[in-house]
Amino acid sequence: MVLIGLMGGKGSGKTTAASYLIDRLGFIEKSFADPLKKACKELFLLSDEQIYGTQEQKETPDDRWFGCTPRKMLQYVGTDLLRDYLDNIMPGLHKNIFTHHFRLWYRDLMMKNPHACVVISDVRFQNEADFIKELGGYLIKIDRPGIASDDTHPSEVELRSIKSYDIVLVNNKTIEEFYSQIISCVDNASQMN
């Protein structure tokens, strides 16, 4: 069993890294935002491209929803509604709706396949980083010089202050060199378990 969490700003290479782990190394991807994306896709009648597409597709205002972008919809529903307020009706949940959902899913997966390798591609909050470490996971921060975010949403701001990662991958060379760094991280993560 190997559990890897990926963190980094928009456009840093998290999706590229996760895709490599899935396609080349047989990892299973589970993001904290999976249930949120499914719910928002249905609620706001969003397309796959608006949810899972390019940065441009996620940032394009949707006139049906008064010019709100799919990214803003996900941020607001995920953080401002679910993460910050669900504890009001589920005391004890605190801000852990997405980690709690993952814990239930992961427990079921480990019972079925204790040797599964899992990548979480969207670590954005300290409680998520702490949760991955609690499960014995390996946390990779991906930094891509020249890609700066001016997004002031709490999910982007808190991400910048997390220091509990195991390693920083600097994504500033060729894709092959980036993949080589990922392989080294998997080797390190495998040795931890």
UniProtKB/Swiss-Prot annotation:
Binding positions for dGMP per the UniProt entry: 10, 36-37, 58, 122, 124, 128, 155
First-level EC class: transferase
Keyword ATP-binding in annotation: yes
E.C. code: 2.7.4.13
Signal peptide span: none
Residues the record lists as binding ATP: 13, 16
Record's keyword terms, sorted: ATP-binding, Kinase, Nucleotide-binding, Transferase
Gene3D superfamilies assigned to the protein according to its UniProt record, in alphabetical order: P-loop containing nucleotide triphosphate hydrolases
Pfam families registered for this protein in UniProt: DNMK
Keyword Nucleotide-binding: yes
GO molecular function: ATP binding; deoxynucleoside-phosphate kinase activity, ATP as phosphate donor
Domain of life (superkingdom): Viruses
Reactions it catalyzes: a 2'-deoxyribonucleoside 5'-phosphate + ATP = a 2'-deoxyribonucleoside 5'-diphosphate + ADP
Stated family: Belongs to the dNMP kinase family.
Name this polypeptide is given: Putative deoxynucleotide monophosphate kinase
Provenance organism: Acanthamoeba polyphaga mimivirus (APMV)
Organism phylogeny: Viruses, Varidnaviria, Bamfordvirae, Nucleocytoviricota, Megaviricetes
